[in-house]
Amino acid sequence: MSALLSPDQLEADLRAIGARLYHDQHPFHALLHHGKLDRGQVQAWALNRFEYQRCIPLKDAAILARMEDPTLRRIWRQRIVDHDGNSATDGGIARWLHLTDALGLDRTLVESGRALLPGTRFAVQAYLQFVSEKSLLEAIASSLTELFAPNIIGQRVAGMLKHYDFVSSDALAYFEHRLTEAPRDSDFALDYVKQHADTVEKQALVKAALHFKCSVLWAQLDALHVAYVTPGIVWPDAFVPDRDASRVAA
């Protein structure tokens, strides 16, 4: 039987999971960050990623609803504000739509979800189901991928600005905000997990939760790579560059 880890040992194990499995290791991100994708492939990434962005506040609301401690709720609800904003023109979702607008995608099509890859939809729904059904500790632990976000954000912004003349720093404003939001959120979640994962069984659960979340992010990139890189198998109802870039959903 495994021994109980100290909080710092648990953190080291969690960081090791991220170092091995976080989606910065996926080949699709290497292509994106090094300028190896064309405009249509970048559009496909942004359109499909919106489904994940759209559901982040739904995920956080599901977690919030299970928190009985008002102090904890006050801290966690900031995540919802960060993405929903205080108006229709503010917040992470609005900033992601600003990116898809800048890439030439029709906003109605993006928001409708009609052109998503099935793999994108299934991965995001699996994440929502996970945080709704698992323990509060596991749900919070699943958010710990944010520990690794600042590094990939730095790579993404620098790489996209360097290699794609159709991308501007203004279009990438979403990522600038996440450079401060993600560390704040992950610091809190990590402290919570280290404090509350106080048995061998709970420590195994939080590590499994982070492992699962890494698989959710990886699966979304698998779907994009199969459809838009190689072998190029696109779901018939999914986004097709050129044909759909300005298509308005019926």
UniProtKB/Swiss-Prot annotation:
Tagged with keyword rRNA-binding: no
InterPro entries: Haem_Oase-like_multi-hlx (IPR016084), PqqC (IPR011845), PqqC-like (IPR039068), Thiaminase-2/PQQC (IPR004305)
Disulfide bonds: none
EC numbers, comma separated: 1.3.3.11
Gene3D superfamilies: Heme oxygenase-like
Pathway: Cofactor biosynthesis; pyrroloquinoline quinone biosynthesis
UniProt superkingdom: Bacteria
Keywords annotated in UniProt: Oxidoreductase, PQQ biosynthesis
SUPFAM superfamilies listed in its UniProt record: Heme oxygenase-like (SSF48613)
GO process terms (BP): pyrroloquinoline quinone biosynthetic process; sulfur compound metabolic process
Catalytic activity: 6-(2-amino-2-carboxyethyl)-7,8-dioxo-1,2,3,4,7,8-hexahydroquinoline-2,4-dicarboxylate + 3 O2 = pyrroloquinoline quinone + 2 H2O2 + 2 H2O + H(+)
Molecular function terms from GO: pyrroloquinoline-quinone synthase activity
Function according to Swiss-Prot or TrEMBL: Ring cyclization and eight-electron oxidation of 3a-(2-amino-2-carboxyethyl)-4,5-dioxo-4,5,6,7,8,9-hexahydroquinoline-7,9-dicarboxylic-acid to PQQ.
Family: Belongs to the PqqC family.
Protein name: Pyrroloquinoline-quinone synthase
Source organism (scientific name): Xanthomonas oryzae pv. oryzae (strain MAFF 311018)
